[in-house]
């Protein structure tokens, strides 16, 4: 059996990790709507530390959006999209939904961010030229089969839309090569098994819910209120399919097969944010939690994955002393009688910057 190492605030398991050979390294990001603000915080810390040793990237829904910002090296991008765009009535509008429109307007979101906050897609080219791969998960509308798409500059935004098209909330699926697709979370909310199928030996998984948490999606509870009874049965079938898939994924993460190693980064408790309709203070708090978890990962596990420790250490500024002034008072210039006792660490050969983490 493989190894699962939980990484969250208050859990000391990462501190016991010893050096190892990661092999092919994959980064997998779970969806979760606005709860993806936690993932944004983790990845912003990774980018701040210039930490990107990964060979493979896999994301679903909000996870695909966060990874897009990461591979394009745009720190703060995902946070701004979530806090500035997904909190507006142009995007999330229950009244519009009650009148027959979309509850979430992905068309508006994609068009608005492309115009006002575009992805720097060309910045990802150097990664892809090195052989690194990025896949977004979306599910077919007819049989819910999960498919994985590698974006190009021409297909990137449409793939993001497809991966995030929550059934019922975005009433129409997204067309890809003549086939209708919906949210990848239906069948593969955390594409860890696909990463293994693509040869990954070590997985870093960023979750948007506490580990080992099983839940009925909040959005389905809303749908029960808003949809007619005749429309509920197909949706109920979809939710049952999603829950079965989610349990299988959770079991895979808890008990990795073979020699697989999984580092699971997750919030220490349920986030304040919801998938939709979150308030800005909640999003801000969850973003900060993500940054703290990202820092903890870098200080414990991250340094095992790269040759150079990823954390930057900011040394205090050295002030150049001014000219020496000799006091005319005789006592002020007397030699010190007692010897100076240096700090213990001054003669400790084992003491270095690593002790400052």
Q: What do the PLM-derived regions correspond to, one by one?
A:
Residues 1-58, 68-357:
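Patatin-like phospholipase
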Residues 59, 63:
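Gly/Ala-rich beta-loop-alpha elbow adjacent to hydrolase catalytic centers
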């Amino acid at each position: 059996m493989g190894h699962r190492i939980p990484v969250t605030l208050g859990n000391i398991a990462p501190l016991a990790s010893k050096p190892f050979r990661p092999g092919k390294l994959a980064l997998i990001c779970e969806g979760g709507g606005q709860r993806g603000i936690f993932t944004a915080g983790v990845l912003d810390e990774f980018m701040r530390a210039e930490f990107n040793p990964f060979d493979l990237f896999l994301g679903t829904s909000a996870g695909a959006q966060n990874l897009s910002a990461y591979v394009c090296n745009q720190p703060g991008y995902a946070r701004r999209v979530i806090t500035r765009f997904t909190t507006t009535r142009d995007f999330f509008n229950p009244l519009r939904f009650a009148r027959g429109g979309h509850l979430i307007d992905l068309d508006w979101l994609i068009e608005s961010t492309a115009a006002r906050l575009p992805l720097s897609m060309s910045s990802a080219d150097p990664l892809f030229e090195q052989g690194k791969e990025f896949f977004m998960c979306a599910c077919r509308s007819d049989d819910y089969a999960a498919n994985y798409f590698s974006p190009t500059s021409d297909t990137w935004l449409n793939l993001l839309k497809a991966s995030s098209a929550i059934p019922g909330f975005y009433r129409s699926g997204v067309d890809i090569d003549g086939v209708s697709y919906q949210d990848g979370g239906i069948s593969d909310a955390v594409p860890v098994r696909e990463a293994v199928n693509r040869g990954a030996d070590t997985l870093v998984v960023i979750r948007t819910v506490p580990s080992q948490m099983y839940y009925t999606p909040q959005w389905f509870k809303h749908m029960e209120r808003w949809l007619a009874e005749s429309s509920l049965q197909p949706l109920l079938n979809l939710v049952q399919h999603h829950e079965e898939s989610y349990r299988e994924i959770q079991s895979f993460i808890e008990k990795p097969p073979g020699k697989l190693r999984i580092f699971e980064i997750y919030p220490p408790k349920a986030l304040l944010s919801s998938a939709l309709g979150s308030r800005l203070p909640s999003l801000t708090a969850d973003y900060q939690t993500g940054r703290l978890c990202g820092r903890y990962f870098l200080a414990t596990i991250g340094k095992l994955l790269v040759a150079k420790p990823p954390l930057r250490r900011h040394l205090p500024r050295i002030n150049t002393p001014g000219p020496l002034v000799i006091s005319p008072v005789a006592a002020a210039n007397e030699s010190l009688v007692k010897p100076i006792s240096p700090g213990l660490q001054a003669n400790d050969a084992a003491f270095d910057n690593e002790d400052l983490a």
